[in-house]
Amino acid sequence: MRRMTLLLAVMAAVLVVASGVALARDFVGTDRGERIVGTDSADTIDGNGGDDTIIGKLGADRIRGGNGKDKQYGGRGNDVIDSDGGFRDLVNCGRGIDTAYVDARDQVAGCERRR
């Protein structure tokens, strides 16, 4: 019984990988600057502190840069980018109908809605 369960679990994992399905994930950064790259699905990404580079890729992503001078790229999909942390950030929403919460000092491109 255990072998059958293990075999079925392995087969399911192989099918997911082979089909190219990217499962959505939650990413949380640290207080150091880092590069965080999402999946091809709808992700939730929080850069936390530091000067981060965040790339959402495909899917309707929710991206929050946090404290620091962040570079945030939404990619394809209807993304929500939160960049109103008081630092001068770079926000590029990408393709899709995107919403960006930004400060007056942020450099913003490709966002259909700015708040």
Model regions and ranges:
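Positively charged n-region of N-terminal signal peptides that target proteins for export
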Residues: 1-5
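Short helix-onset patch at the extreme N-terminus, typifying the N->h transition
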Residues: 6-9, 30
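N-terminal segments that cap or nucleate solenoid repeat domains
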Residues: 22-58
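Glycine-centered beta-turn/loop sites at beta-strand termini
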Residues: 29, 38, 47, 56, ...
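Leucine-rich solenoid repeat scaffolds
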Residues: 82-115
